[in-house]
Regions:
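Membrane-embedded alpha-helical bundles of multi-pass transporters/translocases
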Residues: 1-524
Length: 524
């Protein structure tokens, strides 16, 4: 089983890698086009709302609620009932999201006022940032339809994942990145406001993602006519699971939105610096954390469904799958966190310092990146640990934990006010760590999952190898002034060389410490 999980994880991570690489190219293009000034703040604000919704649906609450229920229908072996269930879910969900999308487009000034209070206050008082509020309202009208597209992308992706077709859903974000890069390069130069072109790119990217998945559903025989069925038993069950899951899974994203509200009161550039640092952190989070979480959820759901046939064995299989997921997060997340800590400024400089993005912006973004990075492992573990609840159709516990984490984040934000925008990143990292701890404590208390002794030994080996890697890379890394003086090709050479050195040292020390291939495959 774990060999199949590892293979699926590699497929998802491979597709995610392509998407994240294009995402970095997209961010490089955006940084060159609009830098980290007022235009960047407005566009990134308008982009954060649909981006939040993408994570909420495509990588979060909807899948967590839908997959376990779909697994029950699939276990019955009745394809016609499964198709009917999918049709009812798509029709009901589609109807609701259509209403929400239309209301949000019409009421975009209200949305902009809620999440950009600082700009709205300036608009009311004819302040210097009044134009930001007006532009944000316009861009939200263009970006909000992405919610409609991404809802069906999440639905079809979850269906395909349950039948082992993980690559389709993992590849679809590539289309969003291509659309945004294309509009930035070819449409933006023809418009007075380049951020308008980027907003159009988000709309087109959502449309392409939606159309891309249809042929795969049809081939699997699961493309069915949507039907409104609010009171259907299966739909009602998803609704009961999803409403709390919307909050529980997305606490970290809600915290980021709260950060955006506060950042709208801070100096120009704050939202942009937080965005670019968050984008670098999203690379390992998506490549490893979300990929592994996506792969193990259907397996965990099946183990839970099969508990009626063999309760004892299913519980063991469930626990082993959780432990395998945690070990994979440690294997990949620990060196990623240490690598980012050492190479934060060089990576920001190589990727973004051109055009309107200056060395000052590199320094500013690096501080928030270091702060966010302190919580990277927690952000990744949350994805795995939350599945331990949602696979068992327990959504109440994560909601309680989510409320605690969100309230704590607000308190941390207040305490971190003296640190300006960096304080927001510190607060997010602290609340994520609290969230992960409480999720684990709950699973352990219910005897669902305990961090095994084998995984503890594995963690110590990983930590030792990662520290050796980080120390050697830090010793060989040029100063930021030397990086700034290099040509672009020389910067690329040095960054690739240091990352290659890190990989060789990390893997070499792991082997010396006794880690072998079977440690990654077995869950027993």
């Amino acid at each position: 089983m774990s060999k199949r999980l590892l293979k699926s994880g590699i497929i998802v991570s491979g597709m995610t890698l392509v998407s994240r690489m294009l995402g970095l190219v997209r961010d490089v293009v955006i940084a060159h086009l609009i830098g980290a000034g007022a235009a960047a703040d407005v566009f990134l604000f308008a982009n954060r709302i649909p981006n939040f919704l993408r994570r909420l649906f495509a990588e979060g609450a909807f899948s967590q609620a839908f997959v376990p229920v779909l697994a029950e229908y699939q276990k019955s072996g009745d394809l016609s009932k499964t198709r009917e269930f999918i049709g009812k879910v798509s029709g009901t969900l589609g109807g609701l999201v259509s209403i929400v999308t239309l209301l949000a487009m019409v009421g975009s000034p209200v949305v902009a006022a809620i999440f950009g209070m600082g700009w709205f206050t300036d608009w009311l008082n004819d302040g210097p940032d009044a134009h930001k509020f007006e532009q944000a309202s316009l861009l939200l009208k263009i970006t909000f339809p992405y919610l409609w597209f991404v809802t069906f992308v999440a639905l079809s992706g979850a269906i395909l994942n349950t039948i082992g077709k993980f690559g389709v859903m993992s590849f679809s974000p590539v289309l969003l990145n291509i659309a945004m890069i294309a509009t930035a390069l070819f449409l933006a130069p023809r418009l007075d406001n380049p951020d308008l072109a980027l907003a159009i790119g988000i709309f087109l990217g959502g449309l392409l993602q939606f159309l891309f998945q249809i042929p795969f559903l049809k081939k699997a025989g699961l493309l069915v006519k949507p039907k409104w069925a609010w009171h259907d038993e299966g739909v009602a069950k998803i609704r009961r699971l999803m409403i709390p899951a919307l909050f529980g899974v997305s606490v970290s994203q809600i915290n980021l939105l709260l950060d955006t509200v506060i950042a709208s009161f801070l100096m120009t550039g704050s939202i942009s610096w937080l965005y670019y640092s968050d984008r670098l952190l999203e690379f390992p989070l998506g490549l490893f954390g979300i990929a592994i979480s996506t792969v193990i959820l259907p397996t965990l759901a099946r183990h839970h469904v099969n508990r009626e046939d063999n309760s004892s064995q299913s519980a063991v299989d469930f626990r082993n799958t959780m432990d395998w997921g945690v070990r994979m997060i440690l294997l990949l997340g620990v060196p990623a966190a240490i690598g980012i800590a050492v190479l934060a400024q060089p990576m920001l400089l190589v990727l973004f310092m051109r055009g309107s993005f200056t060395l000052t912006d590199v320094h500013a973004a690096s501080y928030s990146l270091w702060a966010f990075n302190a919580g990277l492992l927690s952000f990744m573990l949350i994805k795995i640990l939350a599945n331990g609840y949602y696979a068992r159709q327990d959504t109440k516990t994560p909601v309680k934990i989510g409320i605690i984490a969100m309230v704590s984040n607000m308190g941390f934000n207040v305490l971190a006010i003296p640190f300006s925008y960096v304080g927001l990143a510190i607060a997010s990292a602290m609340s994520a760590t609290l969230n992960a701890y409480l999720l684990y404590r709950g699973l352990a208390k219910e005897d669902v999952y305990h961090f095994s002794r084998k995984s503890a030994v594995f963690f110590l080996k990983v930590l030792g190898a990662a520290l050796a890697m980080g120390g050697l890379v830090w010793y060989n890394c040029p100063s930021i002034q030397e990086w700034a003086a290099m040509t672009f090709l020389m910067r690329i050479y040095w960054l690739v060389w240091l990352i290659g050195l890190a990989a060789v040292v990390y893997l070499g020390v792991l082997v010396l410490l006794g880690v072998r291939k079977h440690h990654l495959l077995t869950k027993h």
